[in-house]
Amino acid sequence: MPKQTLERKYEYHRMLPHYQKARRTVFITFCKANRIAFTPEARDAILHRCLHDHTKRYDLHAAVVMPDHVHLLLTPLRDEKGWPYSRPIILKTLKGMSARSVNKLEGSSGPIWQEESFDHVLRSQESFEEKLEYLRQNPVRRGLVRRPEDYKWLWVEQTK
């Protein structure tokens, strides 16, 4: 069976096993541990970390860093052996590196993220467009800005 069609099984901490098909776009949400708003500087650092592995471990289509949570729309890339990077590995790295950055910035230590996260595998272009619009409109719905493009911590991939 070609590697493109293989499924890999991953055990999520405290959750049932998930199967990951190669190159499926996923919508991911993860929240701040205490739900107290991040400072603007912390949001800068988190967005920077989200963009760090874009084109290395995943194609990032969009990201928004809200005051107390993050939404990502991404497609995992393949590692040097041809396997797609797993969502658990992507999230562990992203949450760990962003926590390090925020803790350094704030002179604190320890976890900043809730242990669990939410992910939804997209199955159609329509679903992609719906999730992208949800992500873009999140700052508007929260009353943080009037237009998505006015929100500093929103990044959307430029399509050619």
Regions found by a protein language model. Give the residues of each.
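Short catalytic/metal-binding and nucleic-acid-binding patches
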Residues: 1-160
